[in-house]
């Protein structure tokens, strides 16, 4: 087996428990990958950084707020463009909570944000591109899993964290 290179990343789907709405961001038209699409917070893990630290750093950079990581929705593996080693990315997807009244300041990576119910998000995410379809699957999973989890389990997971060091 040959040793290759890939990047690690995170995604943060942010949920407002009080309104049961999800936060979506529109990517800047200046972005090199998937410009103008609606997405959740995404970003790369820096060298020497854990997934949890990357999650909180990326959310602060993109939104100017801190979130509570509630649980891991899943993992992802994709190519950011052509299927070449330099475009390969593996990542962890978190569901995070944030009060909708929080003062969000979007970075230059995005042009706007919206709080949407799952149904509203599905309507907005009408493009057939792979990134949009991925975001739809993430929201669909979150909206299915969240009601199944007990408050005690979600509290335990959010308080103890996810990394074992």
Q: What residues fall within each predicted segment?
A:
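Short loop/turn microsegments at loop-to-beta-strand junctions
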Residues: 9-10, 50, 111
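Nudix hydrolase/Nudix homology domain
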Residues: 108-165
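Conserved N-terminal beta-strand and adjoining loop/helix that marks the start
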Residues: 1-23, 95
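Short, well-ordered beta-strand micro-motif
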Residues: 14, 93-97, 115-117
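Conserved Nudix-box catalytic region and its N-terminal flanking loop in Nudix hydrolases
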Residues: 20-61
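A generic structural micro-feature
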Residues: 2-6, 34-37, 84-90, 110
